[in-house]
Amino acid sequence: MKLSKRILACAITAAMATSMLSACNGSTTTSGSASNADTSQGNSSTTENSNSGNNSSTDGNGGSNGGNIVEAPSNGDTLKWLGYYDLNTDDKEIVDKFNDAGYKVETISTSSTEYFTKLAQLVASSDSPDMVRYEWQSYPHGVANNLYTSLDDYVDFDSDTWSGMKDMIENFNYGGKHYYLPYRVNPGVVLIYNQTALDDEGIKTDPLELYKEGKWTWTAWKDIMTEWCNIGDDYYGVMPTGFVAMPFIVSTGTTLIDVDGPNKQIINNMKDANVQRCQEFLSDIANQGMVNAEYTDPSTCLSATKTLFAEFGLDWGWTSAQAAAKDQDIRFVPIPRDDKADKYYTNTDTFGYLVPAGAKNIKAALKYMEICRLNEIDPELIAKSKAEMTAEHLYYPKCPECGVSTADKTIEKCPSCGAARRENKKHSAMSEDLYQIYSDLKDTTSDKFAFLFDDCFGFSTDLTNMLQQGDSEGKGCVLGGPFKFGESYTNLRDSYYGTVESFLEPYRALMQKN
């Protein structure tokens, strides 16, 4: 049996876990459907949206609370944005449309590490920004600490603009109110793998084909890893990352921690039978020597080690791995279905914005959010995004010869002067099969998946660190111990259930007050 190098693995995990969650939580600032921020921002086009005049849900003409929508407060044409990047440059196409609507963005800069501290200071000093981005700790942590403004009075969630996101918006219900307006669904955590390596080793089982045939289950996943690991002692089945067991627990139809906003409850499911069963399954895989507990970047994890699968957020993980191995067939599949689940449950993530408490220009913030959402559902922009994501080659908009920019990134030569355009070497083309999975993992209206969001990383940093890494001595790693090191989940559960409860109790008290 192979022994995991635990000390090194724990050190690397401690260094990487926070950045891993941050990278997944906001992989791209632009409201795009593309998987690579450097290549295609599908919904960031300057294409005019034909519905922008008809679907408005923030102009005071609708009603999600009995039709009593009121006009949002405004103090002019300037949107004060607090962030660790500048929307004017990083979300330029959206800002251009925002400018066309008569608004402008003023950036209040902060670092990602000081983000919540700065926000709290500004709110407390009555100098609130008008809009901030969503982070995993925005809900329930930020909402519980009164950092945001409820948007129920100003937005019609049943409008054409927002109805497609209504269920997702409801996921973030807090005491009957809605503070977070996600405008897009992001594909969650997937398993990336190297099909070329499988072919080279003569393994005939194809995870992608198993998924397409409806046979991609925990059992099928374990079987192919067993076959792979039997090749040699230095072969591993899977490399966990900062998400560790979370997406696998979700596949059972249960989340580790559930915030039931309408009923003002925070539920700790550590003792749930599904959580127990999943953790025991992952612990068994680790104890059979299938788990590579040493974190490696997605650009090298499949090519530099003999690891078959790696657990990453789709946007960053697959694009990085494929871009670094152009001569190999890097693919991805969803987290396998739990054999005993009644549906194919999958983890998901969203992106959008919130309005801080005390904001003076809520109207401008809602206009920005509306533009983002309209871009997200524009059929022309969706088609454009697909064309770019599946294109063999992509090119930078600005011609290196004449300087003219061309919106179509798939054209090899500049339409104005005929010169060759500069190719984007970071681009990796998705096959039609992979693009279909990518689309399915964003489509909450489809019956292919049942989407669940685990609230476990939305509380304090200390709780997140404990779930991922354990305490200061590395003990109590609830999500990582069984999966990475084969630890007994029963022992972890019995020893640390009370500790997790102590982290949750203050949030329960705050929820009852709000």
Regions inferred by a protein language model and the residue ranges of each:
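Conserved N-terminal structural module of periplasmic/extracytoplasmic solute-binding proteins
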Residues: 4, 9-11, 22-140, 376-388, ...
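Hinge/lid segment of periplasmic solute-binding proteins
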Residues: 63-70, 134-188, 219, 333
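Short, solvent-exposed loop/beta-turn-alpha elements that line the ligand-binding surface or hinge
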Residues: 152-164, 210-214, 254-277, 337-344
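Glycine-centered hinge/linker elements that transmit conformational signals in sensory
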Residues: 223-225, 260-295
